[in-house]
């Protein structure tokens, strides 16, 4: 009997008060791997969607499990089981902006659902657009709303399902989860061991430690169930890196995800500022049009132009070294700016929130100076229009003297610039990943060594 491929997506199974979508999926996957011998065709996928949309979930990520079942009835049974488990998981939380959804797409993905996945990573997806897409896919989808009439999670679920990562860049993340009795307590992760791990595996892991503030970056804050997350290029490296970190609390579950994190997938190259629509992630080649100014809060603002249109660019205080570089820009410098377009407000127009800066050309600064007196060396003054210069000290005159052109050396070089480590968001690609991009992944490959329960590898 031919098996059927199923893509099951999960979104918004968390709240600001607790819970975590990846934790829920990890918990149910432990049961399915142990008891049902579920046959995955990919690592669990953690898909980060456009971080600029106004109604994003925390982290704006959704999770997808891609697996094979014997028949349609088995797929429905798994969906019902996931739904019941999610209701129980969310029973202790309530939040009015909460739109939890579990959805399923059966069979090979259509070009339409792949398109919506591609678009959702860098652009705005209105709910009515998603409804129109799902109506055309109605014979291949089924979903469950965990809150009556709360449908926005459909966007995350089916966009993540459509973002397959078979011909786009990807990375991996190993996430370790906490025991329930430890949640809300300080995380027992040894900072020095994280620093040592970073030095050993720096080339193939991503943003483990911030040496400017001297603190680990792999441990989140707050009361969610995540103990730590180590991100990197390859699963085997993450396993070795994790084993080097000293942890002084139980870790009931850990799981490796394949993900679009740190790939700049949310940035789309645009031709001009006319395409810089609000909430869109963009990268665009422009010229600096104003001297950067520092405003209240330590943020730096400057204008850029494509020759016809203008837009503000903001380097916020947490970006650290990127903000300091932005302050050195001057009108006429040619740059490529990357970031999310923020909507206008009563105080400012649309603004690109700067994530990365590529300085293409630094315009020389020219200063015109009065010539010096050849007799005494004093700086001469104008003798009047068309009359040359005279020396105020010794009286020497030169009717043919002209201003001296002096080129001032800029304290700025062409190149790529990124923010301080603490300012990185999920999708932002560090410069050290340049040249490490991947562009292929098999349609079907059963992962191994990706899920542990009570420190035991499940197979």
UniProtKB/Swiss-Prot annotation:
InterPro entries: NA-bd_OB_tRNA, TiaS-like_TCKD, TiaS_FLD, tRNA_Ile2__agm2C_synt, Zn_ribbon_TiaS. It is an enzyme of class 6 (ligase). Pfam families: TiaS_FLD, TiaS_TCKD, tRNA_anti-codon, Zn_ribbon_TiaS. One of its GO terms (biological process) is tRNA wobble cytosine modification. It catalyses: cytidine(34) in tRNA(Ile2) + agmatine + ATP + H2O = 2-agmatinylcytidine(34) in tRNA(Ile2) + AMP + 2 phosphate + 2 H(+). GO terms for cellular component: cytoplasm. This is tRNA(Ile2) 2-agmatinylcytidine synthetase TiaS. The lineage of its organism: Archaea, Thermoproteota, Thermoprotei, Desulfurococcales, Desulfurococcaceae. The gene is tiaS.
């Amino acid at each position: 009997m031919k098996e059927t491929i199923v893509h099951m997506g999960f979104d918004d199974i968390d709240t600001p008060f607790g819970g975590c979508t990846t934790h829920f999926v990890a918990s149910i996957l432990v049961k399915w791997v142990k008891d049902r011998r579920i046959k995955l065709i990919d690592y669990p996928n953690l898909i980060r969607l456009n971080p600029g949309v106004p109604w994003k979930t925390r982290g704006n990520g959704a999770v997808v499990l891609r697996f094979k079942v014997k028949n349609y009835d088995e797929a429905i049974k798994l969906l019902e089981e996931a739904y019941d488990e999610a209701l129980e998981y969310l029973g202790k939380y309530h939040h009015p902006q909460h739109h939890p959804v579990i959805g399923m797409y059966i069979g090979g993905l259509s070009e339409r659902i792949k398109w919506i996945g591609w678009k959702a990573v860098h652009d705005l997806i209105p709910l009515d657009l998603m409804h129109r897409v799902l109506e055309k896919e109605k014979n291949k989808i089924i979903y469950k709303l965990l809150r009556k009439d709360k449908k926005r999670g459909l966007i995350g679920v089916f966009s993540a399902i459509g973002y397959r990562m078979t011909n786009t860049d990807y990375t991996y993340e190993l996430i370790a989860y906490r025991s329930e009795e430890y949640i809300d307590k300080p995380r027992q992760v040894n900072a020095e061991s994280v620093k040592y791990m970073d030095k050993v595996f720096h080339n193939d892991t991503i943003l483990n430690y911030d040496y400017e503030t001297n603190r680990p970056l792999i441990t989140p804050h707050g009361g969610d169930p995540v103990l730590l997350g180590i991100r990197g290029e390859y699963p085997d490296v993450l396993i070795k890196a994790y084993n080097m970190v000293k942890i002084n609390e139980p870790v009931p579950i850990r799981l490796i995800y394949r993900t679009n994190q740190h790939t700049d997938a949310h940035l789309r190259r645009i031709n001009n500022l006319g395409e810089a629509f609000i909430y869109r992630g963009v990268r665009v080649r422009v010229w600096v049009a104003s001297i950067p100014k520092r405003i209240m809060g330590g943020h730096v603002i400057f204008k850029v132009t494509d020759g016809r249109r203008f837009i503000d660019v903001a380097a916020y205080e947490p970006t650290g070294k990127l903000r300091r570089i932005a302050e050195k820009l001057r009108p006429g410098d040619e740059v490529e700016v990357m970031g999310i377009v923020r909507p206008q407000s009563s105080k400012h127009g649309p603004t690109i929130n700067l994530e990365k800066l590529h300085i293409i050309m630094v315009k020389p600064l020219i200063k015109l100076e009065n010539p010096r007196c050849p007799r005494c060396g004093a700086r001469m003054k104008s003798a009047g229009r068309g009359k040359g210069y005279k020396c105020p000290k010794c009286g020497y005159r030169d009717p043919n003297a002209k201003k001296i052109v002096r080129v001032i050396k800029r304290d700025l070089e062409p190149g790529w610039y990124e923010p301080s480590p603490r300012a990185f968001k999920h999708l932002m690609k560090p410069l050290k990943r340049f040249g490490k991009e991947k562009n292929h992944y098999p349609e079907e490959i059963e992962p191994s060594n990706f899920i542990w329960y009570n420190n035991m590898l499940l197979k």
